[in-house]
C-alpha cells in the first residue's frame, strides 16, 4: 500500500507542527515548510525521516518554485496539501492600521496560498487523486472590529476553497476548508501583537480554547474519509465561544 505524502505549510509551530506530528503518527510522509530552517531542522530531528524540511518564504513565488523543484524522488507527488501558513497582524481600526501589516497578511494568507496551490494542483489533476485542506478562520464569516484585512484574507480563502471545488468537479480531488475560532497554544496572538506576550496571553485568559491538536485531529479525519466523501467546510469554535452580538453605538 502506497504511503501518503502530505505537504504542510507553516510547519514550524502551532497548527502546522501539530498537523505534521499527527500525520506522521498515522503513517504519512510529511513535507513541512516554513521560513525558519533551524527550527525545521529541530523538528526533523524530533520526527525522523518521515519528515522532510523545506525552508523558504511562501510569499516569494520563485523561492516556492525553487523549493518544490528540490523535492527528492519519492516525495514529488503530493497527495495531501494542507495550506496552513498564515498570520494576523494588528488589531487597530482600518484608519489607524499599518499598511505594511496589511500587505504582509495579503502576501502570506492569499498570495502564498494560491501560489503553492497552483504549483501542486496540476500533478494531482494528472493523477486524478489528492486533497487540499485550507486553514481559514471564522473571521472570514463573522466580522469584528480590528479584523479588517485579516478577515478579508480569510474570506478569500473560504471562497477560493469553494471555487476550487467547482473547478475540480468531475475529478476525484477533494477540497475542504477548516474555519477555526478562538485557538490557543499557537504563536497567533503573539505575532498579531508584534511580540507583546502579556497582551497575547489575555486573549486566552480564563477560556478553554481550541488547541492545535484539535485542529490536527480534524485534518486527519478529513483526509481519512472515504474517497467519495468531501467535507466542504468545517467551522470549529471552543464551547465557550459563540456568535458575536450586533454592535449598537448610541448617541450620548
UniProtKB/Swiss-Prot annotation:
One of its GO terms (molecular function) is oxidoreductase activity. The keyword Cell cycle does not apply. Substrate binds at residue 137. SUPFAM superfamilies: NAD(P)-binding Rossmann-fold domains. The active site is at 150 (proton acceptor). Pfam families: adh_short. GO terms for cellular component: cytosol. The keyword Nucleotide-binding does not apply. It comes from the Bacteria. Its EC number is 1.1.1.-. Transmembrane segments: none annotated. PANTHER family: ALCOHOL DEHYDROGENASE. Belongs to the short-chain dehydrogenases/reductases (SDR) family. This is Probable NADP-dependent dehydrogenase HI_1430. It comes from Haemophilus influenzae (strain ATCC 51907 / DSM 11121 / KW20 / Rd).
